[in-house]
Amino acid sequence: MGIKSFKPTSPGRRQMTVLTFEEVTKDKPEKSLVVTLTKTGGRNVYGRITVRHRGGGHKRKYRIIDFKRDKDGIPGKVAAIEYDPNRTAYIALIHYLDGEKRYIIAPYGLKVGDIIESGENVDIKVGNALPLRNIPVGTIIHNIELIPGKGGQLVRAAGTAAQLMAKEGDYVQVRMPSGEIRLIKADCRATIGQVSNLDHENVKIGKAGRSRWLGIRPTVRGSAMNPVDHPHGGGEGKAPIGHPGPLTPWGKPALGYKTRKKGKASDKFIIRRRK
């Protein structure tokens, strides 16, 4: 794992850094575990933009990831660590003893040839998956379920990790990467270890074109728009905002405004809010 920088042969190269991909051992994905991915350009079924700044980018094939980790009692061998264009973490190709192949999110430190397992009472070892009630307090975990059997939904991005803080009856306390401490059902599964690709946060994009390769379109300032497009738009020359404070494109306060819905059902599971 490392970061590669370049000589300033052009303005775009001057600040650019890329990952060295030292952990990646295979360049072509397993054919049986990929499906075609249709681009949406951030539009919904009616053709309206629902997510701004999306569109273009390199073609991708979706890798089918096993988030459930429900193959109990059958050990699997790590056959390869691969790059996945659909996520920031690396993925690991697992060959199970019964012949099945699956992809999982690769934890930091997992290597080709390692044996991983999932089940009720497997060893507390990087890459193993088991219910939260059987994981010791203080253990670093990732790929955490919110509903038993649904598959991991939390802590899946590159370099992230959560920590099991305490156990209270049918629930356990987990400290999330954001600092939030929340209750999760003890029957939910999690995987031991931290997510791979720790250096992802240190990569500098370097130039606008590289964002376009990733399918990210430019973010235009509201003050550069027309009044019909943004509350900050319009005016002659560089006009002030014209409001007591900055607003979102939909007219809501942009600063200091709590966007979480009040009285949400999951509020009772949050012991301490993120900072």
Curated annotation (Swiss-Prot):
Record field: compositional bias (Basic and acidic residues): 264-275
Keyword Ribosomal protein (UniProt): yes
One GO BP annotation of this record: cytoplasmic translation
SUPFAM superfamilies per the UniProt record, alphabetical: Nucleic acid-binding proteins, Translation proteins SH3-like domain
Gene Ontology molecular-function annotations: rRNA binding; structural constituent of ribosome; transferase activity
Key words of the record: Ribonucleoprotein, Ribosomal protein, RNA-binding, rRNA-binding
Cellular compartments per GO CC: large ribosomal subunit
Superkingdom classification of source: Bacteria
Entries under SMART domains matching the protein: Ribosomal_L2 (SM01383), Ribosomal_L2_C (SM01382)
Region (Disordered) residue spans: 224-275
InterPro entries: NA-bd_OB-fold, Rib_uL2_dom2, Ribosomal_uL2, Ribosomal_uL2_bac/org-type, Ribosomal_uL2_C, Ribosomal_uL2_CS, Ribosomal_uL2_dom3, Ribosomal_uL2_RNA-bd_dom
Quaternary structure and interacting proteins, as annotated: Part of the 50S ribosomal subunit. Forms a bridge to the 30S subunit in the 70S ribosome.
The protein's role, per its UniProt record: One of the primary rRNA binding proteins. Required for association of the 30S and 50S subunits to form the 70S ribosome, for tRNA binding and peptide bond formation. It has been suggested to have peptidyltransferase activity; this is somewhat controversial. Makes several contacts with the 16S rRNA in the 70S ribosome.
Family per record: Belongs to the universal ribosomal protein uL2 family.
The protein, known as: Large ribosomal subunit protein uL2
Gene: rplB
